[in-house]
């Protein structure tokens, strides 16, 4: 199918369909979406969640306490926002059941650049997936999306409708608009003359979806919400005639759908008054002497915390406060999820194929998240950041607390302050374009750009010092360690085999040492007594600064014996035990004198050295670095190493 046929097919599928009122009632009998409220239709569009048993994945089990959680495919690109999404779905479920939430404003509260607008856009987009049914008369569709059931009286007609068409009583009671009431009189009370149109909500055409923004204090009035008289029609109609009214307000257009109010609490208070009755009573007054207008939809508002605090502290606004269902949308606090946000943003730009050195996005994510975290008590903020990402630190940091302990101490406002994803992405843009020749990103340029930006932003001195401490006290040393390991692993071709040999040898020596037995090497025939074994073990332990060798050796041998039982008697992989892995890596790379000629970009004295250097560069490029980045990062690493 070519693009033109594909477009036409889509256009035809979205065309209006017209039915008689009798046909519509027959549809109600078979399809409950024909009379479902806005929250129910939005839930249909969101769909069922994919249930995830977090007990099966160690990282998730630490974050979600082994609970079974639901993940909604409709929100799969909203990373680290499970809690906010769950609250939104909870609001919709309760509203769909006709509970108090149906009468409340769904209010997304969060810091700038935290994803509130993106969530609102996704909800509006989902609203377009399920059609609505609207009254029509004389070929003209109701300007306020009157639902056909508004024609019926709950006291008089509910029993018949429930018995014959399976329409529950609670779906009756929405008032008729002045437009529908006028047509009813014109038809002499004959409701069969009405038609019903099946319409697809549309952001583009503002059908059942509308958006309003705060205007100037002096010139914005409630007509932005409720509409006003259309002076062009006064030539043919009286001022209080429903046909003289311009139903252009956001509440008029959003009936049966969703109305988004951007930065709601920046609007003058007089503009917000129609929302009180629209939410609680399902109707509101227009600006002229016409009868009340119906509203049976969702009001979605969002703003930053400062506006909300100011609004909440004003005693005159108490009527509103009780009608607001708050969903907090904080910044992402998990490194892995923050990285996915950057990847998503990059994929929607020209930089999607630009080289990005390993560690760049992770380093930026670490910096962003450190800025958002509250300082913990009796523990390191760096450990807290890692625990928030689902890491287990029981082997590396005995002071680290559990995820829940950190959350409880930080309180509900954690993640509502700090550097935004928007700020981080602007940093990333500058890093990619830092080099005038190569469009690529690497952590060394990232450090430079971040330091510059911290100075330019003119943060309060204490905050600027805190950010610089994150950079110089943690991120730069951490990255120096990472790139050192990258360089060293690229240098050692048989890295994995070499590491496994050291591991196996260490375990054997430790086992014989613990049992106080001599050991004869099967390959060389060399005999090791307990003292010789101890000397060999210390060669591996000393570079890592093991303070209590006896306990360490017992711990390792016990771990390996347990692992062998589940591994057909074979030793586990040398990387499987974090403590020993660190020890082996430090032993492997304690002597780097022979490493320097290979990784430096100086002129080589022999073809053998040149070949080793070229092989090293090729292996680094296989890891995801460009040739230029290999040189830059090696030179940076050697400088940092020398200065420390």
Identify what each model region corresponds to:
Residues 1-40:
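Long, basic/Gly/Ser/Thr-rich N-terminal segments
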Residues 33-644:
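Conserved ASCE/P-loop NTPase catalytic core
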